[in-house]
A protein has these predicted regions:
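Metal-dependent phosphoester/phosphodiester hydrolase catalytic core
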Residues: 2-7, 11-20, 28-556
């Protein structure tokens, strides 16, 4: 089902079927050179919100800020000054407090005689709430294309808040991933090498914040953020990362600290409360009596090292061997994903949600949680046997091997941490929260999944978003569009938890919640290779409560 987004359906100011253009910064009324990185807000509660900007000056400076109840700034409700300098990369981050619950506000900054563009923000509501609109975004890779989905989110009047579940930046060098294509469209990474130092991470964050579509979204909607892996390095765990080499890149602890410092400087997120560190980066937001959203920290505080399939490729000769791999490694007891502190905060959030009588409990989930095994794609005739080809695609070799032994698709996701997943489901059930809605990023694919624990008991549903620009796994691996679509269909057919998936399009998920129902719209971009694009509704699912719990159903 494909339908074009129009003014009446979602995107304000867009005629039916019309193309949109993410305009250059100067054409969109962006800030002057002093505020070249735009303005942003985020991490709100009922009476406060974080306001952010960065000033492009050569020496320490004092920056004024204003928060108003009107767009003309005639009714200033909060104002102040913030001193910034090179010790924080000239970023400005203030907590505007003493605000009204559910309030709508405008904000701006002033430095060296220059006033920034204004942004719009809001606080969390208290009490009765009839509707909530959230955009689910993930995997925004500057070098892989234009952030058209950000531009669409900025224009989308159904969106109240933006949840970004990680990979807000990417750490790789330009030539590590389609470098020639990145240069062709003017999207080479800065710096061009893989980032390792604090200066590197700051430079990369700065580049991403200069993007006009990113600036439009951040100025229009408050950001609710959590991180995944690429904010630091590919596939980290507590003791290192798959993409970190201590011999050439130094101590992992130093690199991780640099990435986290830059993240907190450049993102509109609160500093940790008493007794917490920046690494303990998880949040809970309460939306009146309608919903609670909790995010997870799954990379730095507790995660066990990922299972590596490579040593098993010669060791597995039977399905019994494959099940031994799952039993002894993937499902090994004690392989954590979440820290005890994060788990305790989740239980507290769910308990409070139930006490408020909220119908919805959401999880901002950095990586897929549904059980997803690879079908035997060679036996199904979807791809040829790599052994019969002189130069098979590397992805085809890996896919054929996983499919032959019916193995989990991504061992870096919850599929590689079966004990931790069962622990989370049991924890939710004990709190009366067996109807969770997981809002998931990481995979670069759209997903609609029904979840169950190891005993088959319903555990909620999962809505997964594709990348803002990061391409889907199959299409990026060299499979053509027809084969990629067949692989999507085979995954859904093979896995009881997968209702539908799509790896062909970049985009975001719009989730609209009301008291008795929800609607998830998978919004796709027809291209990320040009700033001129068309956004359309690729698929829709209603969230309804049935006899077996929370269900996803295509609207009639």
């Amino acid at each position: 089902m494909t339908s074009t987004i129009t003014r009446r359906t979602t995107l304000a100011g867009m005629a039916a079927g019309a193309a949109l253009t993410a305009l250059p910064a100067q054409a969109r009324g962006a800030p002057a050179r002093v505020f070249a990185h735009g303005v942003a807000s985020g991490d709100p509660d009922a009476t406060s919100v974080v306001l952010w900007t960065r000033v492009s000056v050569a020496a320490p400076v004092e920056v004024e800020w204003e928060l108003a109840a009107d767009a003309g700034f005639a009714r200033i409700v909060r104002q102040g000054r913030f001193a910034t300098g090179p010790e924080r990369d000239f970023t400005v981050k203030v907590l505007a407090d003493g605000l009204e619950p559910g309030g709508h506000y405008f904000y701006r900054f002033r430095a060296v005689g220059v006033t920034s563009a204004s942004g719009r923000t809001r606080t969390l509501p208290v009490g009765r709430l009839e509707r909530l609109g959230i955009a689910l975004a993930s995997c925004s890779n500057y070098s892989q294309g234009f952030f058209n989905a950000y531009d669409a989110i900025a224009r989308d009047p159904a969106i109240d808040f933006v949840l970004h579940t990680g990979d807000y930046i990417y750490e790789h060098g330009t030539d590590a991933w389609h470098g020639d294509e990145a240069r062709k469209i003017g999207r080479a990474h800065q710096p061009e090498h893989e980032i390792v130092s604090l200066s590197d991470y700051r430079t990369r964050h700065a580049q991403y914040k200069t993007d006009p579509a990113s600036q439009a979204m951040l100025a229009a909607k408050p950001l609710l953020a959590c991180w995944d892996d690429h904010e630091s390095a590919n596939n980290p765990w507590t003791g290192g990362a798959q993409a970190h080499n201590p011999e050439t890149e130094g101590r992992w602890e130093d690199r991780r600290a640099a990435s986290i410092q830059a993240y907190f400087e450049w993102m509109p997120v609160r500093e940790p409360g008493p007794g917490r560190t920046r690494m303990q980066f998880w949040r809970t937001w309460v939306f009146g009596d309608l919903a609670t959203l909790s995010t997870l920290e799954t990379r730095h505080t507790a995660r066990a090292q990922q299972v590596d399939y490579e040593p098993w490729k010669k060791a597995i000769a039977s399905h019994a061997d494959a099940r031994r791999l799952e039993r002894e490694q993937i499902g090994a007891e004690g392989r954590r994903m979440l820290s005890p502190e994060c788990e305790a905060d989740l239980t507290a959030a769910w308990t409070h949600s139930k006490q408020l009588g909220q119908p919805w409990r959401l999880i901002g989930n950095p990586m897929p949680i549904a059980r997803t095994r690879v079908p035997d794609v060679v036996a199904l005739g979807i791809i040829p046997d790599p052994a019969s080809q002189a130069r098979p695609l590397p992805a085809a070799v890996n896919l054929a091997w996983k499919g032959k032994w019916n193995l989990p698709f991504y061992p870096d996701t919850w599929d590689g941490y079966e004990w931790a997943r069962e622990r989370l489901y049991a924890q939710a059930r004990a709190a009366g929260a067996d109807d969770l809605v997981f809002l998931t990023g990481d995979s670069h694919d759209f997903w609609a999944n029904r979840l169950a624990d190891g005993a088959g008991r319903p555990a909620g549903v999962e809505l997964g978003t594709s990348g803002i620009t990061s391409p889907g796994d199959f299409i990026d691996s060299g499979f053509d569009r027809a084969t990629s679509a067949r692989l999507d269909a085979a995954l859904a057919e093979h896995n009881p938890e997968v209702i539908w998936t799509d790896n062909l399009y970049c985009g975001y998920v719009r989730l609209e919640l009301r008291r008795d129902r929800g609607l998830a719209t998978f919004v796709a971009m027809d291209t990320v290779r040009s700033r001129r694009y068309r956004a359309f509704a690729l698929k829709r699912y209603a969230l309804e409560r049935g006899e077996t719990g929370l269900e996803l159903r295509e609207p009639g």
